[in-house]
């Protein structure tokens, strides 16, 4: 008889979990990263890159296409012109121990951008998006710290580009 009770309890948990998923899905709740139905609606976007970062330009292009927009090199075809004015990453000490040894660092990534219609009308004045992470000083010295910074910088760049796409999607 106890085995039957465990099976029944397990079945009730599965049923409860399924009902919760159905209710949350029905009210529009989505996991982080879902587009939620908002898109760039096929807008043709030209990117003017003043940062010189190939990785950033690639990430922005992929995000535009992944958000329902289209990327173009030709300014004459574009609906919007997205200008990437600059990007910067910086590191600072976040915490130290009693002896003054660094325990944690804070890495920050900032992207300056603006958006205009192809005719020149400004849609978004120049502004900045920022993302940051705190990370423990890794064992292994400067090489390990640089490797960890590079890994986090890529994550922060992706986060800032995601925020940029969310901002652009609100303008359609």
Which residue stretches match the model-derived regions?
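N-terminal segment of the mature soluble domain
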Residues: 40-88
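Short coil/turn motifs at beta-sheet boundaries
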Residues: 38-40, 75-77, 100-106
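Bacterial Sec signal peptide processing site at the extreme N-terminus
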Residues: 21-42
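Sec/Tat-exported extracytoplasmic proteins
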Residues: 64-68, 115-119, 163-172
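C-terminal/domain-edge helix-coil "capping" segments
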Residues: 143-172
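Surface-exposed short loop/turn segments
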Residues: 83-128, 134-147
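N-terminal secretory signal peptides and thylakoid transit peptides that target proteins
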Residues: 1-19
């Amino acid at each position: 008889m106890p085995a039957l009770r465990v099976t029944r309890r397990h079945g009730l948990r599965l049923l409860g979990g399924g009902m919760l998923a159905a209710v949350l899905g029905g009210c529009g709740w989505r996991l982080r990263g879902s587009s939620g139905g908002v898109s760039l609606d096929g807008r043709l976007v030209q990117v003017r890159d003043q940062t010189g970062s190939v990785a950033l330009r690639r990430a922005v292009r992929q995000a535009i296409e992944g958000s329902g927009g289209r990327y173009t090199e030709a300014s004459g075809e574009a609906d919007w012109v997205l200008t990437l004015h600059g990007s910067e990453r910086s590191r600072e000490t976040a915490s130290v121990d009693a002896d003054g040894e660094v325990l944690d660092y804070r890495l920050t990534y900032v992207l300056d951008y603006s958006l205009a219609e192809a005719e020149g009308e400004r849609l978004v004045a120049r502004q900045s998006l920022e993302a940051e992470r705190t990370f423990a000083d890794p064992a292994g010295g400067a090489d390990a710290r640089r490797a960890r910074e590079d890994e986090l910088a890529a994550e922060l760049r992706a986060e800032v580009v995601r925020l940029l796409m969310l901002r652009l999607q609100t303008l359609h």
